[in-house]
C-alpha cells in the first residue's frame, strides 16, 4: 500500500495541536519521550504472543508515534519529508543492495 503523506496531514495535525494550545508542552525532550512511550505501548500487543495481536491497537499507537514525529519536526523547525529523504539517502550508502540484500547485519558488519 502506498503512503500519501503530504502537507495536508501535517497542517491538520498542527491545527489540532494549536487549537488546544498544546504547543507550549511540545519541547524536543517531551516529544522525544512521547514518541518512545507510544512506540513502547505498541509492544504490549506482541508480548508473549507475536502472532495474535490487536492490529487496531497497533495501528492506533503507530498513528500516535507519527503524530508526535510531526510535532517534533515542527518544534525543531525542519521539514519532515526532507529529513526522511536525507536519512534514506544515508541508509542507501550504508546498506548497498549488493552487500546487504537478505541480511539483517548492521552496516558495520557487512
Where are these regions (language model features)?
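Flexible "arm" and connector segments at domain edges
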Residues: 1-62, 66-110
